[in-house]
Design a protein with these regions (language model features):
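Extracytoplasmic soluble-region selector
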Residues: 1-32
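Feature responds to low-complexity, polar/acidic, surface-exposed segments characteristic
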Residues: 33, 121, 170, 250, ...
């Protein structure tokens, strides 16, 4: 028997039966960590002393969620820059954890509180790094200071400020499991976090890609119960996202309902992707052509952009958006608004031929790694990125690897039966339908 005490700590529990022994890690915490700021809500640019804090949505500089904060600073003979912050620190928390995207400038970063300044060390790194600040008796965070003996003009990024205690940091996603009960047409499951327990601040459920709120979650037991709409003879997709106070995300999805024997289009009879294509049809994402879907036909880049725009429900007029592509005039009129919508969101960026010109290549087949990259740019940050395990992982381009890893972890990508991903291979319309259905 294992009995948890009221103190904080971590270790392992080993259970033995004969020659069989199993060891599992255990963390004992007294209370959940607390998100101080994730910068997900847009805020007005704040100006300090030779420093400026602004809202950032450029996803390559986001660690958790969809946004972060950008801190620009300019240091001259004064030797430092300062930006004011205003966060109250509740009792029982004595540490602040937060992510910093460093500029490798060598400047010193310090957190300022009402009890003094906490040195966080040198910005001698590029990319994201988790920093911790001991708060002592402080009751408020009042600012950040960047100092340097030499002149500097640069910027760093901040994300996911989390109040902690006892030296705890959390970089592990919650554990999430789901089961479907056909008799009651419900999905049940459990959500637990090693640090926060069942006090999970983020639970999101989608049904066929749309937000769904007919569920209950017990923050004492971690039990999740989702009551689904009445069965209609079709298969539907239920996805659940769980996020802890530190911004770590986990995701699970499953099919609910009955696989349909009715073909979604004339050419979908007995096709393996019929349920996914039926989802596209009833959601208004694809209406086919002359009663057919052409499931095994490769999809072009402009067709994929249009499907993504429809998937997102983008009905706005983007005619005023100026595309930078040298081949913009080759984009079909029916695809132009979709391409502009995806460009304005930073989903499509084009490619260069080495002459400095950008090309969209609208009629070219979209490759599997290109499609996954576009989907990845739509995905919030915070999911774990495991090692790529496809047999041809070495062929995946560096600009796509992060997204292939993330979508694989999320269960959206499974690869082929031979273990390959085939990054340069074209995607068929059926494959795209399946990915969007799971997404």
């Amino acid at each position: 028997m294992f009995t948890a005490s009221g103190s904080i700590g971590s270790g392992s529990v080993t259970a033995s039966l004969g020659r069989i022994s199993v060891t599992v890690p255990v963390t004992v915490t007294a209370r959940a960590l607390r998100t101080l700021d994730g910068f997900e809500t847009s805020f007005a640019t704040a100006t300090g002393t030779r420093a400026m804090l602004s809202y950032n949505r450029e996803m390559t500089r986001v660690h958790n969620g969809y946004a972060s904060a950008r801190l620009d600073y300019a240091i001259g003979s004064e030797g430092n820059a300062y930006i004011g912050l205003n966060y109250a620190i509740p009792s029982n928390y004595d540490q602040l954890n937060f992510w910093v995207y460093g500029d490798n400038s060598g400047a010193q970063l310090a957190l300022v509180t009402d009890a003094g300044s906490v040195n966080l060390g040198a910005l001698n790194f590029s990319g994201w790094k988790l920093l911790t600040a001991k708060l002592g008796t402080a009751t408020a965070v009042t600012g950040l200071t960047v100092s340097s003996a030499s002149d500097l003009i640069s910027a760093i990024y901040l994300d996911q400020l989390v109040l902690s205690y006892g030296g705890l940091t959390d970089t592990t996603a919650p554990k999430l499991s789901l089961q479907y009960n056909a008799a009651s047409n419900t999905v049940t499951g459990t959500v637990k976090d090693d640090i926060d327990g069942a006090a999970i601040p983020t639970i999101r459920v989608t049904y066929d890609g749309k937000s769904y709120t007919s569920y209950t979650y017990n923050q004492s037991s971690g039990a999740l119960s989702i009551s689904l709409p009445a069965a209609d003879g079709a298969q539907h997709r239920v996805n659940v996202v769980a996020g802890d106070a530190s911004g770590n995300l986990s995701r699970a999805g499953m099919n609910a309902g009955t696989s349909s024997t009715t073909p979604a289009f004339n050419d979908m009879k007995d096709h393996w992707a019929n349920d996914a294509v039926a989802y596209l049809k009833r959601s208004g994402i694809s209406n086919g052509s002359n009663g057919n879907f052409l499931p095994d036909t490769n999809i072009s880049r402009q067709e994929f952009a249009v499907l993504l725009a429809r998937y997102l429900g983008s009905s706005q007029d983007h005619s005023s958006v100026q595309l930078p592509f040298a081949d913009t005039n080759e984009i079909a009129s029916w695809a132009l608004n979709g391409a502009k919508a995806m460009y304005s969101l930073g989903i499509i960026k084009g490619s260069s031929d080495g002459s400095g010109k950008l090309y969209f290549n609208p009629t070219a087949n979209v490759s599997r790694q290109e499609a996954v990259t576009m989907l990845g740019r739509l995905t919030e940050k915070g999911y774990a990125q495991g090692a790529l395990k496809f047999t041809d992982s070495s062929a995946i381009q560096s600009w796509a690897a992060e997204y292939v890893s993330t979508l694989s972890t999320m269960g959206i990508l499974t690869g082929f039966s031979d273990g390959s991903f085939r990054p340069n291979g074209a995607m068929t319309r059926a494959q795209v339908a399946t990915v969007l259905y799971k997404f």
